[in-house]
Regions:
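Conserved, single-site charged/polar hotspot
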Residues: 1-312
Length: 312
C-alpha cells in the first residue's frame, strides 16, 4: 500500500490497490499529489519500458500541466544507480566494467544534481538517454554488487566532480567537448580525444554498432533536411564535410541544394539534420534497423551516388 498526500489531506491505500489519475482528477486542484510507498515500490501500470511495467522506489510526485501529467520520482542516489547501471550496461559484463559504469553513472548524476535539468518540474534529470536511462531494467545482482562495491565513489578533476559522459559504442576514437561547440579549457580538459584500442585493435571492433551505414535516397534526404532545418533547399545535390574535430568527429557540414545552401555546426545538430524516418541503418553484423530522429553518430563519411547518399 501507499500514502497519498493531496494538499493538507492524506489517505492510505491497501496493498495491491490501484489508484488512477487523469486531467479531471479533483485532487489536482490542491496542487501536486505525492505518493509514498509504505514498503516496496510503486508500479506504473500505464507506462511501458524494456522490462514491461516499471516500478519505482522513493517518493512519487504527480502534477498536472497544460501539456499533460508529469511524474517526478525522488529517490536516493544509490538506489537510483541500481536501476541505471543495468539499464546502461548488460549485467553479464565483467564486474570491473560494471564498477566503472557505476562510478561514471554516480559522477554524472552528482553533476546533474547541481542544477535542475527541468526547472519547471523541479527535476534534475529524466529517465532517457538524454541523461541516463533509469528503470528500463530491474536491479540485477551483479550490477547491484558493482554499485555497492563503489558506494560513494566519483571521478574527480581539479577538486571537482568530473562530468563523465559515456556512450554505448565508439568507432575506435573518442573526442572532446568541441563536438558540442564547447571550447576546451582547464575545467573540461580531461575530456580528450583518445584511441579506444589495445594490442589486438579497437576494443569494440566486434560490436554491431562499431561500423554502420545508411544508403539514403536523395529524395528522402531532401525531404528530411527541409523538415529538420525548416529551409527549402530543394533537392540536395551534395553534402560536404567542411570541418572535423578531435578524433575525426564531424563538426560542420555544408548542404548544397538546388535552391540554396545551408551550413550545420556541431555533432548533435548535424545528426538531427540528417536524421528522421524513411531509411534504414545497416550495422556491421548485418542487422538492419529503421532510422530515427538522430543519425547514429557524427563519426562518418559521405559518398554521393546516382540517386543516394551513402553515409557510413
Amino acid at each position: 500500500g501507499m500514502i497519498v498526500e493531496t494538499g493538507e489531506e492524506s489517505y492510505e491505500t491497501a496493498p495491491g490497490e490501484t489508484v488512477g489519475f487523469n486531467q479531471d482528477t479533483e485532487d489536482f486542484n490542491e496542487g501536486r499529489i505525492k505518493l509514498i510507498p509504505k514498503s516496496g515500490e510503486i508500479q506504473f501500470q500505464s507506462v511501458n519500458r524494456g522490462i514491461g511495467t516499471p516500478s519505482y522506489g522513493g517518493t512519487i510526485e504527480v502534477s498536472l500541466y497544460d501539456e499533460g501529467i508529469v511524474v517526478v520520482n525522488e529517490v536516493g542516489i544509490e538506489d537510483y544507480l541500481k536501476k541505471v547501471v543495468p539499464s546502461e550496461m548488460p549485467s553479464g559484463f565483467n564486474l570491473e566494467a560494471l564498477k566503472c559504469q557505476a562510478v561514471c553513472a554516480r559522477s554524472y548524476a552528482y553533476r546533474q544534481m547541481a542544477s535542475y535539468g527541468y526547472p519547471e518540474y523541479e527535476a534534475h534529470v529524466d529517465d532517457s538517454t538524454a541523461y541516463q536511462v533509469y528503470g528500463n531494467s530491474q536491479p540485477q545482482e551483479r550490477s547491484t554488487q558493482a554499485v555497492n562495491a563503489t558506494c560513494g565513489e566519483v571521478v574527480m578533476y581539479h577538486g571537482q566532480i568530473a562530468t563523465t559522459y559515456y556512450y554505448s559504442t565508439s568507432c575506435g576514437e573518442t573526442t572532446s567537448l568541441e563536438a558540442w561547440g564547447t571550447p576546451v579549457n582547464d575545467e573540461n580538459g580531461y575530456l580528450q580525444a583518445v584511441e579506444v584500442s589495445g594490442k589486438v585493435g579497437d576494443y569494440e571492433k566486434d560490436l554491431p554498432w562499431y561500423r554502420w551505414e545508411a544508403a539514403i535516397p536523395v529524395q528522402t534526404l531532401s525531404t528530411l533536411v527541409e523538415q529538420n532545418l525548416g529551409k527549402g533547399l530543394g533537392m540536395i545535390r551534395d553534402i560536404q564535410v567542411t570541418k572535423k574535430g578531435p578524433g575525426g568527429v564531424v563538426l560542420q557540414i555544408k548542404l548544397i541544394g538546388e535552391n540554396g545552401d545551408a551550413t550545420v555546426d556541431t555533432e548533435n545538430k548535424i545528426r538531427a539534420a540528417l536524421g528522421g524516418n524513411g531509411y534504414e541503418i545497416k550495422k556491421q553484423d548485418g542487422g538492419v534497423v529503421p532510422s530515427s530522429k538522430l543519425l547514429p553518430s557524427a563519426f562518418f563519411t559521405v559518398e554521393k551516388g546516382a540517386d543516394i547518399f551513402l553515409i557510413k
